[in-house]
Structures are given as C-alpha cells and as structure tokens.
Amino acid sequence: MMSASRLAGTLIPAMAFLSCVRPESWEPCVVPNITYQCMELNFYKIPDNLPFSTKNLDLSFNPLRHLGSYSFFSFPELQVLDLSRCEIQTIEDGAYQSLSHLSTLILTGNPIQSLALGAFSGLSSLQKLVAVETNLASLENFPIGHLKTLKELNVAHNLIQSFKLPEYFSNLTNLEYLDLSSNKIQSIYCTDLRVLHQMPLLNLSLDLSLNPMTFIQPGAFKEIRLHKLTLRNNFDSLNVMKTCIQGLAGLEVRRLVLGEFRNEGNLEKFDKSALEGLCNLTIEEFRLAYLDYYLDDIIDLFNCLTNVSSFSLVSVTIERVKDFSYNFGWQHLELVNCKFGQFPTLKLKSLKRLTFTSNKGGNAFSEVDLPSLEFLDLSRNGLSFKGCCSQSDFGTTSLKYLDLSFNGVITMSSNFLGLEQLEHLDFQHSNLKQMSEFSVFLSLRNLIYLDISHTHTRVAFNGIFNGLSSLEVLKMAGNSFQENFLPDIFTELRNLTFLDLSQCQLEQLSPTAFNSLSSLQVLNMSHNNFFSLDTFPYKCLNSLRVLDYSLNHIMTSKKQELQHFPSSLAFLNLTQNDFACTCEHQSFLQWIKDQRQLLVEVERMECATPSDKQGMPVLSLNITCQMNKTIIGVSVLSVLVVSVVAVLVYKFYFHLMLLAGCIKYGRGENVYDAFVIYSSQDEDWVRNELVKNLEEGVPPFQLCLHYRDFIPGVAIAANIIHEGFHKSRKVIVVVSQHFIQSRWCIFEYEIAQTWQFLSSRAGIIFIVLQKVEKTLLRQQVELYRLLSRNTYLEWEDSVLGRHIFWRRLRKALLDGKSWNPEGTVGTGCNWQEATSI
C-alpha cells in the first residue's frame, strides 16, 4: 500500500498541474492549447496530459532532474521549450526525439553532469540553443555538430577555458551568433580559429566579453570576416589591451565594440595608444562604451578610425574636444550619455546621421557645419537655443529628421528657412518660446511628423500650423489654449491621421474644429476638462477609428442625439469620467449599455454621482425612473383642474363677483325698483320719458341710473354689480340699435342674465325703443333668442301706444313690490318667482 508521504508527493504536483490546464480557468496558461506557463509547480516529471497542439511550453523552476529518451513525445508540435533551472543533471540519448518543429531550447541554470552524445538528436529545426550556466567546460564535448539549422548558440557563464572552435562548427553553416561571454578564456591562438578559415561564417557575431584575456596570438584573426565582435571588460591593464588589440590584426569586422560595463571597470588608465592597433583592422562600425576616464585630445585617439562609416561613444568622459573636422569620413556619429566640457564643434562633410543624446556639459548649442546631414538627434541634453531654426544653425539643407526633445529653452526666431526637406520634427518636453507669434512651420510643406507635447506652448494664434499640408502625425499634449477653447487651427492639415490633444486643459471646442480632417484615424482628447460629450464636432471625421475621452469630467452627453459619431469609429474610450447616474441622464446611460462593443474597457466606467451610486459600474446600473401611474394620473388631473378653474375664474370674474354679492346681500332690502341698462345715445328718452313717468307717477318707482346713482371713484364694473344689480328688484333693458352696438351694454346685459339666474325673485323687462334690424340683432345670439321667446314692451310714440306702454310697464314693476297709498315701500326680496315680460 502506498505511504501517505509518497501519495502526497504524487498528488500535489498533479493538482498543481490540473490547476494549470482546467478549462474553467486557463491561468497560468497564456493561450489555451498553444502556450502553457507552468513554472514553479513542483513537477518531478514531464506532464503528459497537455494537448498535442502545444507549441510553447515553460517548465522552468520545476525539479525535473532527469530527462530520459522521448521525454517530450506527447508534444510533437512544440516550438519553444524552456527548462531553465530545473535541476537537470542528466540528459539521455533522444531526450528531445520527435520535437522536429522545436526552434528554441533553453537550458539555463541546470547543473548538467551527464550529457549523452545523442542528447540533442531529433532537433532538426532548432535555431536557438541557450546553455548558460550548465557547467559546460569545453565546446569540444558539446554534442551539437548535427544541428545544421542552428543560428544562435549561447554558452555564456560556463567553465570554458579554450576558445578553440571544434571541427563540427563547419557543419553549423547558419550560425549567426556565438556568445562565449563570462567564461574562463585567457588566450586565443591561430589554431583555435582554423575552422573559420576553412568554412567562413560571414554573418557570425562573436561576444567574448568578461573573459580574462591576456593574450591573442598575432595573425589569429587574419583574413577572418565577422559581422560583429564584442570585447568588453576583457583586459585588466592598458598594456594587455594594447597587445590583444594588436593581435586582432588582419580581422575584417563590420561592427567592433570595445570598452567596459557600468561599474565593472578593470582598467586603471586609458590613453590614445590603446587603440593604435586598430589601424591594422578593417572596420565599418566602431563603438567604445563605458570608459569613465577623462580623455584629453580625443581626436588623436581615433586616428585609426577615420574611415569607419559609423562611430559611437557611449558613456565616455571627454575633457576637451578639438574639431571633429573634415578629416573623418564618418557617415554616422553617435555620442550618447557622455560628459563634455563644452558642446563639440562639428565640421564633417560626409556625415549623414548625428545622434547626440543624454549628454552632460556644454548646455549651449553652437552652430555646426554638416552639409550632408539628413538625420539629427539632439534630444535629452538640456541644450538651449537662442534662435531656431534655419539652415545656418545646422549647416545643411538636406535635413529630414530633427529631434530637439527634452532640452531647455528654445526660442523660435525663424520658420525653418533652408530646412524645407524636413519630414520628422520633435520638440517634446522642451520649452518653446514665441510659438504663437508667427507661422513657425510655414516652410515645412514636406513635414509628416510633428511633436510639440509639453513644450509650454499657449495657442493664441489660429495660423500656428499654417504650411503643414503633408502632416500626418501631430502630438501637442500638455499645452494650453486661450480661454481653454480649441479654435479652428487645423484647417490646412488635410492629411492628418493622428492627433493628440491630451492634457491641454480644454473645456470647449469649436463645432468646426475638425471639419477639414477627413483622413484622421486616431484622436486623443484624454486628461482634459470636458463636462459633457459633444458629438457634433466629429461628424466630418469619416476615417476616425479611435477616440479617447478618458480622464475628463464627463457627466453626460449634450442634448443632441449621439448619431454624429462617424460610422468608422471602432474604439471609444470614456473610462475614468464623472458619470452622473440619475434619471435626468438615463438616455445617455442607456446609450452606454447599447454601445458596449464600441466602448473600450466599458466595465471600468463607473458612476461618480449621486453619492449612493459612487463607484458602481455603469453597466450594472438599473435606475427605475418610471413613477407610479396613479401618481402621474392624479398629478395630471390636478394640473388640468387647476388650469380649467383658473381659466373659468379669469373668464367669469364678474359673474363670480355677482354670485358673491347675491350671497352677501341676498336677504337685504332693495333700494331701487329697477336698474336701467341703456345706451348713452338713448339717454334723452330715458331722462324725459322713462324717469319722468315712473318716478313722478303714481305709484312712484325708484330707478337706479348710472349717471346719478353710481359711487364716484369705484370701478364701473363694481358699481354695475353692487349698486345696480344687488340693490334693485328688477332690471329694465332698453334695446335699441345703439344698445346692440355698445360693448358695455352687452356686458351689462350678460351680467343681468347671470343675476336673473342666481336670484329667483329677479326679473328682466325688455323695452324695444325702436325697430332693430334682424341681421344686427342676430349678432347677439342670446338676446335675439330671448326676444324671440319672451314678451317685451315696444315703445310707440302715439297717445294710445303711450297709454298701453306705461300701463303694462307699471304692472310689471309692481310685481313683487309692496305699496300702500301713503307711499311706503315694503320689502322687495320676498323670493317669489319673478315674472319676465
């Protein structure tokens, strides 16, 4: 029966492996069925239940210890295998058999003690073999002679003492890189490189750095051609260095790298004699790196390098520099991370590329004379330019690439006269002055790339980009605009495909700011101060694919619909904004949910307000913005009722006043027998006939007349209601042609109708003073209807007619009136039903 400890030793690795391949979670797998990263899972053997389709397998840091034959037969498609630090001590014959597609094998950090002659058999496609720190003592016993496809062999940090290249190297015809750095090689003899004489490897790059070199036999490298030779930290004294470099005589190398590594210097001193032996080499490109010595008279140091095409100094301290003059035939000069006493004087007729970056000292730029220069990189030097830029500054009219980024103050005093061939221009993180005073780039009609990011530029001039008709990429992040408003400054940039306006403190933009940018594909508006998403300015961007509005303060979209986004848009970034998750913005929040395929990292879009929803993902938001139907119905009905009441009160204000008066005076005494309504045109008849006969007759009747009985200073309407109707038993309406045409008379008549309706004892007596045309009478529908249906008195100016008229009128007025011969007037409001004649 299996012991508990043994069972645990089996189950723990198995469980670890299953955690790697379970379908629910492919971690730590990178690409299911293709790439598996199973580091540090405590495997003691090669897992056999990975899919056959596996192409990339990382088993590093597992205690495999032993690789037997056909260890990887389950992975016939394997292309990359990493076995770093797996404590492998033994590799048997055919361990990698069946891996015919394997191109990369990494064995770093394995203490190999037994390596069978057929250990690497079957690797018919292997191109890269890394055997760093594998206790390898000699290349002679390394069984790789059959790996004809091998391009890169790295055996650094081993115990190799001899540089002798075995005869099998003649089979490695595709070998391009051999790394023997950090071994124990001290001497190189002619016989060590015999195989390279017999079978030249013209593309071979050889790294011998960090070997304690003491001797190179003269002629050892004679007539040998290499692509690259690196010798860094190889020599412990200047004399040894001189001797070894002289031993390289006859070598033809495309690129030679000499020097030391940072903080690992062995040399105590360095002078011009160290490189004298280079005169016997044929070199195309030369690099000297990390010599932390104060070199004086550096030009004499490179007398043997006047004809190299490329010259490079990296991390070299130079006390004094004479002219880099026309004697040098360099086409490419690179000075990186060096220390200068002053900016060097450059006068190089054939130089096409100058890289002068990250240097210290000599902060003031001085003019150079480089008539063939096409590429100039002066970045990261802290340089200041009193005037920039024109042909006289650089001594060339052929310049196509100019990088002045990460420098000091650059004062723009010229619009690049003589530099019309420029295609690439970079000013980022320098301090530009006078940028908005004139059209700085007016001459640069061939410019394709422009970067003025973080240059303290304040755009106050709409013609700042005039002339840039060929520009495709514009980066201007970290600058500012007048009033934080983006104006129409891109009108000439019709070929622009990339525009970066991030971190510009923008709050608003012109609706036509981008109208001319029909070719624009990428627009970055992030890190600004927009509070709403305005889609209208983008309607003309028919080629736009990427729009970044992240890290603004966007709460919602503007009121217009969101259809103005171009149909070409594929990626919209609205992350890290201040979304307001309220009912007021429900349509915008719903739009976000509908456009989740368009939005970048939509799951990171979170609510900022209100406080109870802060931090909540917009996608998971579920706002109920519909009110209860009953509440809505009651609210609407209440509004309608209030509105109708208000309209009725306004329209029937005087009728309501009459109603209030009837309630107030309904049971009081009447002062008048009748209130007379008539036209002022009929006032003579009223005075001479009506008043005289009724008030002076027997019995006498008291009439209410406006010219006599209305109270001065009171509104006419109030007098009509309070003095006329409320204090009278009856109403006499004198109908005439003038009456019908008078608005006041009609108003009084309408109030009289309401009064008659409200008071059961009230009565209206109509007197038709003269014949009225029916067409005129029909204009007053209610009056016409009443006269048609009710009895009325008609005035006739004859003896008989008068007699009948006054008798009938007195009879009508006596109805409801208490009268005694002594002339005492009784109550008139006895609430008996009135008789209307």
UniProtKB/Swiss-Prot annotation:
Residues 24-629 are extracellular. The keyword Chloroplast does not apply. It is found in: Cell membrane; Early endosome; Cell projection, Ruffle. Glycans are attached at residues 33, 171, 203, 280, 307, 495, 524, 573, 622, 628. Phosphorylated on tyrosine residues by LYN after binding lipopolysaccharide. Ubiquitinated by RNF128 via 'Lys-28'-linked polyubiquitin chains, leading to proteasomal degradation. Residues 1-23 form the signal peptide. Residues 651-837 are cytoplasmic. GO terms for cellular component: early endosome; lipopolysaccharide receptor complex; plasma membrane; ruffle. One of its GO terms (molecular function) is lipopolysaccharide immune receptor activity. Disulfide bonds join 29-38, 279-304, 388-389, 581-607, 583-625. Transmembrane receptor that functions as a pattern recognition receptor recognizing pathogen- and damage-associated molecular patterns (PAMPs and DAMPs) to induce innate immune responses via downstream signaling pathways. At the plasma membrane, cooperates with LY96 to mediate the innate immune response to bacterial lipopolysaccharide (LPS). Also involved in LPS-independent inflammatory responses triggered by free fatty acids, such as palmitate, and Ni(2+). Mechanistically, acts via MYD88, TIRAP and TRAF6, leading to NF-kappa-B activation, cytokine secretion and the inflammatory response. PANTHER family: TOLL-LIKE RECEPTOR, TOLL-LIKE RECEPTOR 4. This is Toll-like receptor 4. It comes from Gorilla gorilla gorilla (Western lowland gorilla). The gene is TLR4.
